[in-house]
UniProtKB/Swiss-Prot annotation:
InterPro entries given in the database record: His-Me_finger_sf (IPR044925), HNH_nuc (IPR003615)
Lineage: superkingdom: Viruses
Name of the protein in question: Protein 3.8
Lineage: Viruses, Duplodnaviria, Heunggongvirae, Uroviricota, Caudoviricetes
Pfam family, one: HNH_3
Amino acid sequence: MRKSYKQFYKAPRRHIQVWEAANGPIPKGYYIDHIDGNPLNDALDNLRLALPKENSWNMKTPKSNTSGLKGLSWSKEREMWRGTVTAEGKQHNFRSRDLLEVVAWIYRTRRELHGQFARFR
């Protein structure tokens, strides 16, 4: 039987250290979000408190996305563009053959539902 186990210390990430040095401890249930989405930019004016759901709204577009815009997809069956925005557990959808109409709807709906955490790419 082993007498001791290796113990690893994981230091807080730098953006957390920067936030706590200026603002004190992070409230329970909150994350520190990078406003510009760049995890290397730890300037205090680029950091903000975010709930987990708000942090997920601000995620980058997945690499598997072929349309280039979050929430935009092409339906082969209906031959229409589809816009999808999710907030508070509810999925909001809009379909149209006009691409610009769907893109405008996505931008407008994200701004309305996600506020300052809206991210489009």
